[in-house]
């Protein structure tokens, strides 16, 4: 899992590339929390356009990010979600809790 971060006007964007599975989830959570704690954004955008596969570990990542952003009074948006991860989010109900673009 490759992760790149950019921040602009209290919006943090994390661009994800590769497989979001149990191998990459821990590193992604650590990086996301580090970036959130550094930039203190009001919005976190997870750009998933580069995600080629996602299992239930991706749900844990999104929920952890959502929890941290709620502590800061902010929100999470999932952007450019490919078909396979979207099916996982829809089946889990995450799509009802987190905005998807």
Model-derived features with residue positions:
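Amphipathic alpha-helical interaction surfaces in cytosolic regulatory modules
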Residues: 19-98
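Short hydrophobic/aromatic patches at helix-to-coil boundaries
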Residues: 2-4, 97-101
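Short beta-strand/loop segment at the start of cytosolic alpha/beta domains
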Residues: 1-15
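Conserved catalytic submotifs in the C-terminal HATPase_c
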Residues: 8-9, 49, 101
